[in-house]
């Protein structure tokens, strides 16, 4: 079992990073929370979750998910334990909402907050709350995640959205509208706002 990966950051995008360790480059899928946490780091230690990807169009493969903190990984694992919430949906939730906000929404039964995430309908939101309310209890999540903006914000946001499976043209239109509305949006803000309108 792979508990964590530590090494040099070869590539960094809002949706994934490539970490080199002992001459091997690992592609690790990340949330926006983790992307923000990495800042301008040259090296990183990410706590990992491994999953098998089984699709009709591609061969079976191992997918690595990485998280800046153990707490974020625990929340990811709790989310994927809920029927109807897969790895991509859980990662999308952690990108659209902070771990604190997700936990608060579950504890307080706030369906609307969970439903604000693309792909989470009423039934899935209810299932998340019912299945996880007792498991989460009074658990606190670290709020050490900080925002970051570098390179071309629009390009990075576009990469993240297309990696998450959204249409490139629609994503670009949404990002252009958002930047016209507020040119100061960070990459994370752009992606979060785009997730709400796509």
Spell out what each predicted region is.
Residues 187-198:
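Amphipathic alpha-helical interaction/assembly segments
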Residues 11-113, 128, 134, 138-141:
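Long, highly charged, low-complexity intrinsically disordered interaction regions
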Residues 7-9:
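Conserved hydrophobic positions within beta-strands
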Residues 90, 102, 125, 171-174, ...:
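Small-residue helix-packing motif on alpha-helices
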